[in-house]
């Protein structure tokens, strides 16, 4: 009976990690596609030029793919080394997430101020020929979220000139609508709009976070169960 349950657990873990691996492959593909596209998803931060959406998706996809592969191979081959590696990687990811979450809440005010200042510094690169992606990214977020600048529309004045904002800041977009006109532009800054979006979707994001946490804990539990069984028997059990 116990042997049958462990065999069932073995293949459940394999199937779960196979899906996990396929998701990682999908994320990696999306990240590569974004990196070779027109640069619409470039980084907003000049301090972290590599911190773009494409690079983040590539890194996450790679980690998910490698972790899923270790889980699949460790389960189907009943390999203690691979199962232990799978467990350690999940543990490191879990601890990293918890540490980053704690640090974020402890230093929230400082993080907000530094992020705002860094984004404002990034606005200075808006018209740079080597940063077309950043320009496209700002145009997209301002048009989609109905916002202008980082804290408000005046953030653009040092960049584009007095009383001048990008045309995508206009409530009704038209050619040169952002020149010498501030009455018909979005007044709310994009930083505040993004915070509002997170606040409006906190329940959904919280649910997703809890699902990820449960998946990680289950993966660790399954891998250790198989590891301990193989260690106790000193040999593989037949499927």
UniProtKB/Swiss-Prot annotation:
GO CC aspect terms: plasma membrane
The UniProt record lists the keyword Transmembrane: yes
UniProt keywords, alphabetically: Glycoprotein, Membrane, Transmembrane, Transmembrane helix
Chief place of localization: membrane
Residue intervals on the Extracellular side: 35-55, 107-203
Membrane association type: Multi-pass membrane protein
Location in the cell: Membrane
Topological domains, Cytoplasmic: 1-13, 77-85, 225-239
PROSITE patterns found in the cross-reference section: TM4_1
Residues passing through the membrane, by range: 14-34, 56-76, 86-106, 204-224
Database matches in InterPro entries: Tetraspanin/Peripherin, Tetraspanin_animals, Tetraspanin_CS, Tetraspanin_EC2_sf
Residues annotated as glycosylated: 180
PANTHER family linked: TETRASPANIN, TETRASPANIN-9
UniProt family annotation: Belongs to the tetraspanin (TM4SF) family.
The protein's name in its UniProt record: Tetraspanin-9
């Amino acid at each position: 009976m116990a042997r049958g349950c462990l065999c069932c657990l073995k293949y459940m873990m394999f199937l779960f990690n196979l899906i996990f691996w396929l998701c990682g492959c999908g994320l990696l593909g999306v990240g590569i596609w974004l990196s070779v596209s027109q640069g619409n998803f470039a980084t907003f931060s000049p301090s972290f030029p590599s911190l773009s959406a494409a690079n983040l998706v590539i890194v996450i996809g790679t980690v998910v793919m490698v972790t899923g592969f270790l889980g699949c191979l460790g389960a189907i081959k009943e390999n203690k080394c691979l199962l232990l590696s799978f467990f350690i990687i999940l543990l490191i990811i879990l601890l990293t997430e918890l540490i980053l979450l704690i640090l974020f809440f402890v230093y929230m005010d400082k993080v907000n101020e530094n992020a705002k200042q860094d984004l404002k510094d990034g606005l200075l690169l808006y018209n740079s020929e080597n940063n077309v992606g950043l320009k496209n990214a700002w145009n997209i977020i301002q048009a989609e979220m109905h916002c202008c600048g980082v804290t408000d529309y005046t953030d653009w004045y040092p960049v584009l000139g007095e009383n001048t904002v990008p045309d995508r800041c206009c409530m009704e977009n038209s050619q040169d609508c952002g020149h010498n006109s501030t009455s018909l532009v979005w007044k709310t800054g994009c930083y505040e709009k993004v915070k509002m979006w997170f606040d409006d979707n906190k329940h959904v994001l919280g649910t997703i976070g809890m699902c990820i946490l449960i998946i990680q804990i289950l993966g660790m539990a399954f891998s250790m169960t198989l590891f301990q069984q193989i260690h106790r028997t000193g040999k593989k059990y037949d499927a």
